[in-house]
């Protein structure tokens, strides 16, 4: 079963890692590849040992094993590249979704600010209209009071 790197390992940029950290990172990410390399190396060493001892049959057997193990290693490498390539694509897609979500939040915030601004302008307009109406009523009241005084004076006379 493959081991997926933790978020702290994934966050660390490969350019910032040392050689040994990169080796450990990639071995954890694709454990079948180093296992295939080790088994292929073992098959080559056994084939060389059998060639030196003159045992052609076993040497041929181990060379065949080497070819099979190399093929398995390449398949694991390609499968891992495909898997992590699609995972990287998904991560980019998630980043794009996060950008779109942030943009949508920004648009909603702008709309909310515009709505509040419009509401404030309407309140100011209503307040101004109320002041004008109050001023009109005050002037009308003053006019009526003046008329009432005139009527009272004319009545007294």
Curated annotation (Swiss-Prot):
One Pfam family recorded for the sequence: HIG_1_N
GO cellular component, one term: mitochondrial inner membrane
Membrane topology: Multi-pass membrane protein
Chloroplast keyword on record: no
Keyword Mitochondrion appears in the UniProt entry: yes
Any one GO BP annotation for this protein: mitochondrial respirasome assembly
Transmembrane parts of this sequence: 31-51, 67-87
Highest taxon, organism lineage: Eukaryota
Region of interest (Disordered), ranges: 120-157
Localization, UniProt: Mitochondrion membrane
Database matches in PANTHER family: HIG1 DOMAIN FAMILY MEMBER 1A (PTHR12297:SF3), HYPOXIA-INDUCBILE GENE 1 HIG1 -RELATED (PTHR12297)
Name under which the protein is recorded: Respiratory supercomplex factor 1, mitochondrial
Organism annotation: Eremothecium gossypii (strain ATCC 10895 / CBS 109.51 / FGSC 9923 / NRRL Y-1056) (Yeast)
UniProt gene name: RCF1
């Amino acid at each position: 079963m493959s081991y997926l790197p933790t978020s702290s390992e994934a966050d660390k940029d490969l350019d910032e890692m040392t050689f040994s950290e990169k080796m450990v990172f990639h071995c954890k990410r694709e454990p079948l590849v180093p296992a295939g390399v080790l088994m292929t190396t073992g098959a080559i060493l056994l084939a060389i040992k059998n060639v030196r001892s003159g045992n052609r049959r076993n040497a041929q057997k181990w060379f065949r094993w080497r070819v099979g193990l190399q093929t398995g290693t390449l398949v694991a490498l390609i499968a891992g590249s495909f898997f992590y390539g699609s995972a990287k694509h998904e991560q980019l897609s998630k980043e794009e979704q996060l950008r779109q979500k942030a943009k949508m939040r920004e648009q909603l915030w702008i709309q909310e600010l515009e709505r509040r601004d419009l509401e404030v302008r309407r309140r100011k307009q209503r307040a101004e209209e109320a002041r004008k109406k109050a001023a009109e009523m005050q002037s009308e009241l003053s006019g009526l009071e003046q008329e009432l005084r005139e009527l009272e004076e004319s009545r007294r006379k």
